[in-house]
Amino acid sequence: MAGGGAGVAKRLGTLLSGLLECGAFCGIIFGWASLVFVLKDLGYFKDLCQPTATPSPNRTLLPDCSWQDEQFSLVFTIGSFMNNFVTFPMGFIFDRFGTTVARLIAISLYTGGTLLVAFSTPELAVLLFPAMSMLSVGGILLLLTNMQVGNLFGKYRSIIITLYNGAFDSSSAIFLIIKVLYEHGLSLRAMFLFMAACSAWHLLRTLFLMPRTHIPYPLPPAYDYGLRCPGRSQSYRTYEEKRPPGEAGPEETPLEPSAPRGARGDGDPPGVSFRACVCSRVFAWHVAWLSVMQLRHYLFIGTLNPLLDHLARGDSHLVSTYTNAFAFTQLCGVLCAPWNGLILDRHKRGKTPRPEGAVGALADLRASVLSLVVTVTLCVLFSVCAAVPMLPVQFATFVLQVLSRSFLYGGNAAFLAIA
């Protein structure tokens, strides 16, 4: 860990506050099943329910709410789609304009989303569509800006990246808290107004505990970040201004010494462009792999409430119990994700120092193979359990789902950082 301007206390403050931010705000849309329970109780989309006659002797009329379930699933589907579709333009904004601009956009989207939910009613249930999309995009952008915090901790970088992704998974339990508080008499509007007010905390963290541009890797000497009252921000830009002319900065230093002009061999690759990275087979296969895995998880989360309702034969108490159990398991995401980080960083903890340059990068890639295999195995086991139409088996499904998701997102972020 490089010594310098930002002390251990400040780095730990950034790490822990980022962990809280990811764990309480970034991925709350994935706790959708708990919020749906509340929204159904409030009567959102209830006009889509149609009365049907049961085969009982007295021809009791029970509502058929399949259209209501489809509408709730559509809200989640659009929100989760935006979570992935907007990642690319948001990543461009983050790279082009830096951390502060990206986080201000994220905070604006997040605040707008919470306010839309707060002021929605059963008559204005359509507001859920833009609200969930804004919460989803704002949350993923906050997560993207927090990934770079791993650069502050050197050899623990992959562990911290996976830890943040685990906290992102665990944030889905926030909707469980909302569900429990709602059952104890707190209104949905009051809770979402409180979440909107928390944007002030995000703003303070943006100003004082995050860089204006990016956290470089490896860290330059005396690196500092954030505003310093009443002085000037000692960010990477300040370091760049102080650097003697002609000296290479940390992001400009090549991994290996450059060959003299004309000495490059025929087989030596030139500098890799962004287009070459996007068109590479490794990236294409990784995107395809991630898309299939994510689709499985999104399908499960988006259809969980009607699935539990079907398996419980309409028993709302059972549905509530299993919904709570699912949300509680999501809290464990932050505990499961570092296991994947340990797998990814296992070759860095030996007595032999990690090789530098391209050889070290290749060692990192090889270490990620086991992580990818374990992730796929967990997803297969989760899918098998989810296919069993028995309620008690769903407890095992919930556990395997949170393990699989934690390994998927944490391993994906770390793999992209390595590759």
What does each of the following model-derived ranges do?
Residues 344, 351-412:
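C-terminal transmembrane helical hairpin of 12-TM major facilitator-type secondary transporters
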Residues 1-41, 45-69, 257-284:
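Cytosolic juxtamembrane N-terminal segment immediately preceding the first transmembrane helix
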Residues 28-39, 268, 274-338, 409, ...:
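Extracytoplasmic gate region of multi-pass secondary transporters
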